[in-house]
């Protein structure tokens, strides 16, 4: 199963079309329009979570209809995380689509991610799992209190559950020492960050 995660900053239909042309089975799309504001080919379906007054900036999950994707029972809204079970490509898998967001929220990005990891621990422990998306988190993050949870705590929690970062596993790089940024603050090449991750037990 091919999975693509891509932040669709200032989402447009042309961006969606470009991403879908990459021919993945499942897409995790932070900063995505809600389903009502984009057009999808009939072979695709979509889930979305976000704020009703900010429909151009939520978390979208798009998949080919040969897969079965559904939100877990009793889903608790954590901004913005979508916990889904995926069937149709071998054995069932649990995927926690992730875009921790502090819009109208008093918690920090790592705090939200850590909350989701604990909330969905039942599924992380029982299914082949992936936590994937734009985490809005990095090592030594400013404005984050240790008492509330840091990204280092999030990494430790995922590793404790057998989730490993695919990027770091493949490159051998250390967290906080990534050579390939995934984001440039204000499009400034002198302000690189590594914010996008895929942690997996698969």
What are these language model-derived features?
Residues 32-102:
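Structured beta-strand-rich core segments of catalytic domains in phosphoester-bond hydrolases
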């Amino acid at each position: 199963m091919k999975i693509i995660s891509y932040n669709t900053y200032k989402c447009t239909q042309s961006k969606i079309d470009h991403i879908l042309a990459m021919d993945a089975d499942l897409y995790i799309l932070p900063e995505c329009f809600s389903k009502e504001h984009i057009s999808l080919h009939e072979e695709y379906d979509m889930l979305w979570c976000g704020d009703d007054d900010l429909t151009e900036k939520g978390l979208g999950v798009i998949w080919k209809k040969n897969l079965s994707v559904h939100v877990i029972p009793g889903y608790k809204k954590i901004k913005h995380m979508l916990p889904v079970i995926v069937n149709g490509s071998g054995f069932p898998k649990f995927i926690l689509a992730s875009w921790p967001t502090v819009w109208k929220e008093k918690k920090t990005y790592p705090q939200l991610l850590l909350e989701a990891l604990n909330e969905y621990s039942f599924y992380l422990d029982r299914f082949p799992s992936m936590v994937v998306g734009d985490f809005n988190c990095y090592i030594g993050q400013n404005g984050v209190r240790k008492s509330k949870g840091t990204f280092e705590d999030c990494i430790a929690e995922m590793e404790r559950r057998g989730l490993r970062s695919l990027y770091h596993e493949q490159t051998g790089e250390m967290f906080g020492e990534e050579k390939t940024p995934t984001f440039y603050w204000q499009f400034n090449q002198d302000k690189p960050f590594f914010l996008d991750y895929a942690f997996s037990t698969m």
